[in-house]
Amino acid sequence: MQDIKQFVESGQIARFPGGIHPPERKQPASEQPLRRVPYADELILPLRQHIGLSGQCTVRVGERVLKGQPLTDAALHQGLPLHAPTSGTVKAIEQRPMSHASGLPEQAIVITPDGEDKWRERQPRPDYQQRDKAELLDIIQAAGVAGLGGAGFPTSQKLAQQKPVSYLIINGVECEPYICADDRLMREHARDIVLGMRILAYITGTDKTLLAIEDNKPEAIDSMRVAIAEYDDIELRIVPTKYPSGGEKQLIQLLTGHEVPSKQLPIEMGIIMQNVGTAFAVKEAVIDDKPLIERVVTLTGECIEQPGNVWSPLGTPVDALLEYAGFKPEQQQRVIMGGPMMGFTLPITAVPVIKTTNCILVPSTRELPPPGDEMACIRCGACAEVCPATLQPQQLQWLAKAKDYPALEENNLFDCIECGACAFVCPSEIPLVHYYRQAKSQMRNQAREQAKAELAKKRFEARQARLEREKEERLERHRKAAEARKQMQQQQAQEASEQPSDNDGKSSAVAAAIARAKAKKAAQEDGSSTPAQPADAEPEQKSKKSAAVAAAIERSKAKKAAQQTARESDVEAESPATEQQRPAQDKSAAVAAAIARAKKKKQAREQQTSDDRASQSPDQEDKQ
C-alpha cells in the first residue's frame, strides 16, 4: 500500500498491457449541447435494470402516478426501486421485449404520460454533511442509483463496503469510440459532478479523490479543472487515449502503478471507483431528492441526421429516440445499443432505454461494415497481444466451444472485461467476446444451480436434525412423565398404608365369622364331633384335626368288625350241627358271610365318602 501511495503522490501515469487505438469518431455528437427528448406515447420500464434482483410492483394497472414516485420496492439483496419518469397512468404490467441482444421479454411497467409532468413531494437536503453516512446510503438506494458507466451495480451496495478506502477514483475517461455522454455532462454540469464527488468522499471516508479524464476531451478537462480548484483533496489525472483505458482495473493500474490481482476487487486495495454520471446522479438523489429517472444518451452514426447527446427519460423506446434524431435507415440497417466495441445489435427497436444505456449507434454499412463470416483460427496470436487482462483469447475460445468450464475457470475467464479488443484485431473475424459471454452465462447458471442444490441439501439436513431433536425431546418428556406417575403412585400407596381405614377391622371380623360357619357346616356333614376350627388356624392344626378324625373312624370300623365276628362265633356254639344239618348250616353260614361282606363293603364305601368330605372341608376353609 505504501508503494501505491508513493506512486499516486508522484502524479505519474503508468501503462497497462495490450490495448488498441480504434477510430474515435466522437464528433460531431460531442459538439452539440445536451437536449431534452419529449416524452414518448408510452414509457416501458423493465423491473430489473441493474445487477441484482428486481423489486415487486407497488402500483396497479389504471393507477395514476406522479413523477419520481416509486413503482417497485427494493429487493432484499442488491435491489433497487424503480421510479416514474413523469406523471401519468399505469397502462399495463406485462411482458415486453428487453434491451438485450436476445430480445427476450421480461416483466415491465408501461406508463402513459399525461403531459403534466407533476412531481411528487420532494425534500431537498443541502446539508448532507450533517447527516449520518448510513442515512445517505439509504437515500441513494431509495433513489435507485446504479452505476451508469458499466454493468449497473447498485451504488449503495458498492459504497457500503466495510473496508477502509484510501482512494476514490472518479472515471471520466469514456474511451470507447462514438460515445461522448460523459464528455458533454462534464462540460455542462461540472459543479454538480463535483458535489456528487464530495458526497461520495464523505460516505467512503477517503482523504484523496482522483478524477481521471482522457486527453482527447480538452473542453471537459478545462471545465472540471475549474470546478475542483477550491478542493485540495481532489486531484485531476489526464490519461493518454487508448482503448480500454476506461476499464476499472486498467484505470487503477494507470493511476496507481499496480494491477488488481486476479479474482479480487479494487476494494481489496483500498480503492473504490465511480463514473462521473454516477456522481451526478448521487448529487441529484441526496441534495435535490431526485431519483434516477433519466440519463444522458449519445445518439450517433451516419444514419442519423441530428447526432448529439440527449436527456432521455428511462423507458423511452429506442424507435422514439431515432425518430427524434432524424433516423434514415438503409438496407440491412443495424441499430447498436452501446458502442461498436462492447455494444450489441438490437433485434428490434421497440425496446426501452434503461439505466445502463449510454449510446444508440446507427452506422451505415460503409461506416461500420457488418462482421464477415467466421473462419478458422490461424493462431497468429494478435488477440493475445492486445488483451489488457493478459489472457489467451484463442485458448479461451476453444475451451468455451468445448464447454470445458473447469478449464475456463483455471484460465481466468472471468478476468475478461469483454472489451472486444481481441475480436477487433482477429483476421479470421471470430466473434470471441460472443463465445466468452455465452460461457460466462452458462457457468453462472451452473453456479446458481449448484448453490440452490447446496441450499436445499442444508435445508434437508437441518430438517432431519430438527425432527430427530424433536423426537428425542418427545421421548425424554414421556420418560419423565412416566417417572412422575410412578413416583405419584408410590407416594399414594405409602400414604394409604400409613393411614388405615376404620372398615379394616370390620372386614376382618366378618371374614373370620364366615370361615367359622363354613368349618362348622363341613364338620356336621362328616358326622364328626370335632369342633370347627377357626378359618384363620395354622396349616399344622388343620392337618392334626384331619388325622384325628381319620383315626376315630378307623377305630369305629375295627370295633364293628370285632363285634360282628363275636356274634358269628356265638351262633355256631349254641347250635351244634348234626351230620344231616351241616349242609343247610353251611349254606346259611355262607349266606350270612356274604351278607356280612356286603355290609362291610357298604360301610367301607360310606366311610370313604365321609373321609373325602372331611378332607375337603379344611381345603375349602383355607381357600376362603
Question: At which residue positions do the language-model features occur?
Answer:
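Charge-dense, low-complexity intrinsically disordered regions
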Residues: 499-624
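Acidic low-complexity segments
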Residues: 92, 97-148
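Conserved hydrophobic positions within beta-strands
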Residues: 88-90
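Ferredoxin-type iron-sulfur electron-transfer modules in oxidoreductases and energy-metabolism complexes
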Residues: 357-371, 384, 388-501
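Short, well-structured beta-strand-loop connectors
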Residues: 60-73, 92
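N-terminal, Lys/Arg-enriched amphipathic/low-complexity engagement segments
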Residues: 1-58, 110
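Hydrophobic alpha-helical positions that pack around
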Residues: 207-314, 318, 326-328
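Gly-rich Lys/Arg/Thr-decorated short loops/hinges at beta-loop-alpha junctions or inter-strand turns
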Residues: 117-119, 147, 168-182, 303
